Amino acid sequence: MNEVIKTQNLSIGYNGKPLMTDINVSLNAGDIVALAGPNGAGKTTLFKTLTASIKPVSGEVSLMGRNLSDYSATERASLFSLVLTDKPDDMFLKVLDIVAAGRYPYMGLLARLKDKDREIVMQSLDTVGITALAERNFISLSDGEKQKVMIAKALAQDTPIIFMDEPAAFLDYPSKIELIHLMKRLSREQGKTILFSSHDLELLLRYSDQMWLVAPKKSLKVGSPKELVDNGIIDKYFPPISAKELFSLIL
């Protein structure tokens, strides 16, 4: 498999104090990987470390075979995009302008959109199903619509890797299904690699190729949803969920 991200003996945390240690994982091109675990377990810290928002306590993160720290911010922005729970500082921006900001790695902050950029922006709006919202102010949208805008912005960035932090948050059930189908299309048809976090166990089990499980005072566990269920590992990370319920989710 073609590894796009790999960690070696990675320890993550803040102020030199490790929250998780000995993380040795990899992301393969075209995979959908789910990051799961309770609040406070280290999901956000791992996300921030893999995206160079914070530095590792120790160890290494490799991106496309190079140390992550060797890339400039612009170089990183052409390789991975982010869908975070944070929203734009200027809530009065139009949807079109926010999605167009995804093109900045290719045009610079002061440059104008070229025809190709506009085409990609409009295609991204259409892919997520929000073309009709293009001229709306972001502040006027529902929470679910705002989430779709941020996903469209990541698509406009046109990167081989997409990180999504709670992408299904605020989405109603039909929109969740749309998101799932979109993630599958991006993975299978365009070869996008997607790492997403979620508290939605059905989403995690049913639609990911691989899961990374984190929990306080436990080592990170990696495996396919079926492997983690069959081995009883899911029960240790999601104790309120019975084995019968778990099997019903993935069958």
Task: Specify the residue positions occupied by each region the protein language model found.
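H-loop/switch region of ABC-family ATPase nucleotide-binding domains
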Residues: 198-199
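Conserved ABC ATPase signature
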Residues: 137-141
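Conserved ABC transporter NBD signature motif
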Residues: 59-67
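Catalytic Walker B motif of ABC-type/P-loop ATPase nucleotide-binding domains
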Residues: 162-165
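Helix-to-loop junction immediately C-terminal to a conserved catalytic motif
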Residues: 51
